Swiss-Prot record:
Gene giving rise to this polypeptide: serC
Documented EC number(s): 2.6.1.52
Cofactor(s) essential for the protein: pyridoxal 5'-phosphate
Protein name: Phosphoserine aminotransferase
Presence of the UniProt keyword Transferase in the record: yes
Subcellular location: Cytoplasm
Cofactor binding description: Binds 1 pyridoxal phosphate per subunit.
Organism: Buchnera aphidicola subsp. Baizongia pistaciae (strain Bp)
UniProt entry keywords in alphabetical sequence: Amino-acid biosynthesis, Aminotransferase, Cytoplasm, Pyridoxal phosphate, Pyridoxine biosynthesis, Serine biosynthesis, Transferase
């Protein structure tokens, strides 16, 4: 049994993901007495000036980190990304028969999550699903954006730039005409790299990967979209209501917002999104180089479409997968089991995963191959 170097634990979970240690230490210090108020942040009213200032600071830091133009609204809500799978078509479809051909939306299918969003949209719209993930020589790849057969009259286009299960990424940014409403599910890539928000009309992200703990959903949307929100949308999902109430239509997850605010400060402290992106490129390149250096480990995505956040791989002898996960756990490398739909092994290396955590995984992979290869 491999038992070396177990003093430090690294969490490779796809979500809830690892949180920076120094942020957790700050939470520990403040848990019982936040800002000398003699009570926890969890006990503070969401309508108090103290908590409103927390949310205002979060929005300010998001605007600075992501260079969000003033014409975009920032909203926090409930329900995760799956909640948005329903909310988006409900808010933006035409108030007509869902199968009507003047109620068309484009959904780019690149994997499980984008397809799940498309299936939900079919309940409300005529959904044009474009399959852009292909396979050649047992390697998955994404068709270039300029080959996507987009409907010129579609109400919007939805896509997911990073599929966490298969580890497939669309690194291109949208280059469609200015009138096209582009919606992106950034749940697993938000804050991990620089993006040109002006190429999107609406992006959203669940919080439990790069933003903070689970429990909130971030929406960044152009203010022009608020002009045509359907009135029949339930209030808790209605974007106009959420914007006008400053994300306080009902009680938000105050603790998750507080902790997310600390993580944004941590990102600023270490150098912002530019530094985060640099680290993420280093981490993912190191891990993929390890996989490609041997026939023992296999990744089935072409290099141009490999995810920087989620690195799935298999072992040439698939019977070793369970052994790998168990021995890695004893080595201090947790949550490496692949998704149930794909199997194998998956290392999710979000923002909070330090380079030394990936180095420790690589060292374990070398030891494991030497033992079982």
């Amino acid at each position: 049994m491999i038992m070396n170097d177990t003093t430090k634990v690294y969490n490779f979970s796809a979500g809830p993901a690892m949180i920076p240690r120094e942020v957790l230490c700050q939470v520990k210090r403040e848990l019982y007495n936040w800002k000398n108020l003699k009570k926890s942040i969890m006990e503070i009213s969401h309508r108090s000036q103290e908590f409103i200032s927390v949310v205002q600071e979060i929005k300010h830091n998001l605007r600075k980190l992501l260079h969000i133009p003033n014409s975009y609204k920032i909203v926090f809500c409930h329900g995760g990304a799956r909640g948005q799978f329903s909310a988006i078509p409900m808010n933006f479809s035409k108030n007509a028969n869902h199968s009507s051909h003047n109620n068309v939306v484009d959904y780019i299918n690149s994997g499980y999550w984008s397809y799940s969003a498309a299936l939900e949209a079919k309940k409300y719209c005529y959904t044009n699903i474009l399959n852009v993930c292909k396979t050649n020589n047992k390697k998955q790849y994404i068709l270039p954006m300029n080959t996507w057969e987009i409907n010129d009259n579609s109400l919007y286009l939805h896509y997911c730039p990073n599929e966490t299960i298969d580890g497939i990424a669309i690194h291109e940014e949208p280059k469609f005409n200015d009138k096209k409403i582009v919606i992106g599910d950034f749940s697993s890539t938000i804050l991990s790299k620089r993006i040109n928000l002006e190429r999107y009309s609406f992006i959203y992200a669940s919080s439990q990967k790069n933003i903070g703990p689970s429990g909130i959903t971030l929406i960044i949307m152009h203010e022009s979209l608020l002009q045509n929100i359907n009135s029949y949308v339930p209030s808790i999902l209605n974007y106009k209501i959420l914007v006008n109430s400053n994300s306080m239509f009902n009680t938000p997850n105050t603790f998750s917002l507080y902790l997310s605010g600390l993580i944004l400060k941590w990102i600023k402290k270490i150098g912002g999104i530019k530094e985060i992106e640099k680290r993420n490129i280093i981490k993912s390149n190191m891990l993929y180089n390890m996989i490609d250096s041997t026939d023992f480990y296999i990744n089935d995505v072409v290099s141009n479409n490999r995810s920087r956040m989620n690195v799935p791989f298999t072992i040439i002898n698939t019977k070793l997968h369970e052994i790998f996960v168990k021995e890695a756990y004893k080595y201090g490398l947790h949550a490496l089991k692949g998704h149930n739909l794909k199997g194998g092994i998956r290392a999710s290396i979000y923002n909070a995963m330090p380079i030394k955590g990936v180095l420790k995984l690589i060292n374990f992979m070398k030891i494991f191959e030497k033992k079982y290869g």
